[in-house]
């Protein structure tokens, strides 16, 4: 390879690293100078108000201190943060700015954080359990120096074991043809064909082999098999990864295979299961351990003698003796380290831990035969070059379609710093150096199909063992609407659940989506799903905090994290809250496609996405996700959860009617979304308008038409049009016939039932959707003339009070195209009230609308209780207009019939009129919007005003002077009165 190519590559990488380093230093400086402690905590780099919960001595004499948040309430959890195991942190007293000590973070949970302090802090660090402390993440100079040193070594590398590898990796030459390898037996006989092909390919490659492992495909299993086969061939392996967690994962897997492994790194950064394989632990078990301990004891004794004596000659002798002892100690320790390193078949370390300024400097240059870099796609390319220079062959494993390397400098990332070595080589060499694992063992096939089509060119398939598994298949989990679907989309479009509009906030939150998440989790838990099997993923720290405040106390085992915290993890159910809901259509952090891929593919059996489709559809990739869930999953609107959300803003007046009704744990129904051409608001109302009731017996004289099962949900637009025309022809044939009813089979999908509802409404027919689950079917019948038998099917009239026996919602028309939005929304809420009242009805009570000739007492009772005209069944435009006008002149609060023609207040938040009893936003359900509006006004003007919220006017200067004179005069009079009284008192004495 031309020297200029290596030099230009190194120069570019050094420049990018310098930009990254400058950005990190500037960020830290800016935080310390301009950010308050609360702002630092909101950024995730500081933890405030911590108390010491326990102290103990850890491995090799280290002091482990566990901190917990100060207990001020029932929920004691740490705020959302970016701390991870291995971070260098500074400990500060809560009331002081000086740093008490520096330590290494060893463990962090939702409720506590543990820090390891060196022995040097034993006597200086006195921590009181009653005091409060804070932890601040510190910049790490060591990593930057090691990256820079590795690049300079690469620049000067002329001859050595890695010469051919450098030639291939930097583009000077193509990988050599594969060599023939002798037949071998797999340690793991359960490997699938793609995994076996990857193992054989990696062993046969001469310079480089890339294992592309999408989520759940057993990448680590494949890497372990490759390492075991290489060790069997007598090769020495250096295995690295960018994080301690990834390295320890490999340590655990290899330890089960009884191979000689050695883990390099700070003991405090290692998992407990990996600490017994650490270098310090191995040295403690070696033959030289006792000799080394004796030498250290001798050094301590000489130090003690040196302190006691005052004679200069003796002090000089003691110092010389200490030098000799230290020299002997160093020699014996290095000999023990070399012995341990050479005896190990596999040495494991992080990329930076494999640096030549560590224990590996004691080994010869050609000691290792193969370097394995796991999770290569998450590592900066410069960090990969630290281990790559130590062997002639490398095996890279990872997934460049998941999270990229983490960077701070946006400029450096755009210039190429966020582009990993694996991504660059895949684009450069393609199939000549890459083998992809194509069978995944984690996700339901519906989840797999989206990831495969969106990110992996359709090559990813689900193993039969997981292709159809659902939450309901878990032990003790009931078969419910939530546990029987792999994909669920809860759409908040048009429901007013906007993100928090805070200009000064660095993060985003959405309280409305938090409540939807809470309701869905409760539905899953009630069905028997263990909270520890559920993960909630949010893209913003503020949303994570809101979720933890709402859920952690009730479900302590529930994991709530950002996307970065779940890389490499999996859960039975995953709930994603996208947060963003705004009129500008801004998606912000969500625009990173790979983050969404990671979030969705953490789930095994169930994925629920809560988002505003109008906002996220402005991003092409997110639109494909929403469209896929719409086509292949269950779609619900937040309106279906409105019963559980709105009453929080109501007073007792609005909830008396259903105060004894059990609170529903989830939505009452779910339908698949209609075509994309429909407006989201219409979709929401149409979805919420279909209620459920028990399936009725088929009446005589009904006409039954069979319909092929529509189980294949991935239908194209042409198929949807064909089905629409088919249903239209069936209904038009029914209209022309003399049959009284037309019944459709239960094999129709929810989308097909929606089409039938719409077509029946167009023809002025009555359409009932009855039954639950797979037994749900539609019956279309002719409408009875108004007044026949004194009873007519009615829509709930907005101004009318609650009816004694409300008509089932399935008998209501799906939508009224001529009605205003106000009328639709109010009718929607009345329908929900009716559902709750209907759930309390006695079983012996006759169902409304079953017979055309009810008892006279029932007729009288219904006539007496029914107030206000009902909307006509026929499409009478004048009657509809009259109903809308009457609704506009009636209080829009549920169950209130007060007139607002003379006295009424208009709500600026929901654009409706209310009577004086319900006009306050907190009463009729606009409390959140009112508070958000008030916060916006305060944020915009920067002043919090008392009273009406108007700015206090400054007094006129002349009037102010007059008032000041009157005040001075009054004060003078009072002062003179006190003086005269004092004199009179003195005279009397």
Curated annotation (Swiss-Prot):
It comes from the Eukaryota. Pfam families: AAA_11 (PF13086), AAA_12 (PF13087), R3H (PF01424), SMUBP-2_HCS1_1B (PF21138), zf-AN1 (PF01428). One of its GO terms (cellular component) is cytosol. Residues 765-775, 954-972 have a biased composition (Basic and acidic residues). This is DNA-binding protein SMUBP-2. The gene is IGHMBP2. The modification Phosphoserine is found at residues 797, 800. Residues 677-690, 833-842 have a biased composition (Low complexity). The lineage of its organism: Eukaryota, Metazoa, Chordata, Craniata, Vertebrata.
